[in-house]
């Protein structure tokens, strides 16, 4: 009974102490020693996490759809232009055709001149004139026997060109060359103010120092022709070279000379005239007249026939620059069937 009463007394005291304790203001901060009050429901609810707003994705720029058009056909590559043939080859073919076929070859000659004009227009004009001189040679050129005709200029504008002839092996002159010189002497006396040009190189097999021109000039001087009038060209070995080197000398050293008269054997006059005319044309600008003109000839008489068409072709081919083909044509070694027959 006493023990029960004691426990009741203790409980009563504790209850009274709790009821008498002062209340803590709501606004007062809790000290570390104080026990925190129970959290509210709001405090227990976590704050919502902010969700980042995505940046707007830029809309792609619309690409214009190409409107189909008519596509032109690709241009094919140009056909390569073939290299033109060398001029000398065209001249050779042209000369051989005309020498072989004569008037029948005129169409072929025109065709070859057209080919030449496409690549060498200035040369084509010159060679057209040369071929015309060849075609009309026989009807244009009359051979004067013994002396030059009357009416030529008796001034230093005229040059009498004496063509050489092969020397004997010891360097002396053959009779035919003396015959040419006798004609040249008559011409020099008839036109005493004209130059006399001797042309021809070394052709003596046993005396290399002897030249046709040297022998001729010595002979003329001994016969009374003034040395101031006598000109010497002693490097040429063919008639085509006679023409080229003589023209070169006159144009270079004697620009006063405007006309030449050729002295040779009768069979040789026409071919020589053609070569000198051709060389004069080749030295002339297209559209101009040659600086030197062949105006006359004089010849010693022989029993020989005129030089062949092959010989004439050979001289022109040599003037064009092909000495080997020229030699073959001149000495009848050339294959005249080299080019196809004409229809």
Positions of predicted regions on the chain:
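Bacterial N-terminal signal peptides that target proteins for export
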Residues: 1-8
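Bacterial N-terminal signal peptides
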Residues: 9-18
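Ser/Thr-rich, Proline-interspersed low-complexity disordered segments
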Residues: 19-83
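Extended hydrophobic blocks
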Residues: 78-159, 244-343
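N-terminal nucleotide-binding beta1-loop-alpha1 segment
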Residues: 158-166
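Surface-exposed cleft-lining segments at the edges of enzyme active sites
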Residues: 165-173, 205, 229
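Histidine-anchored nucleotide/phosphate-binding helix
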Residues: 174-193
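A non-catalytic structural micro-motif
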Residues: 195-197, 217-235, 281-304
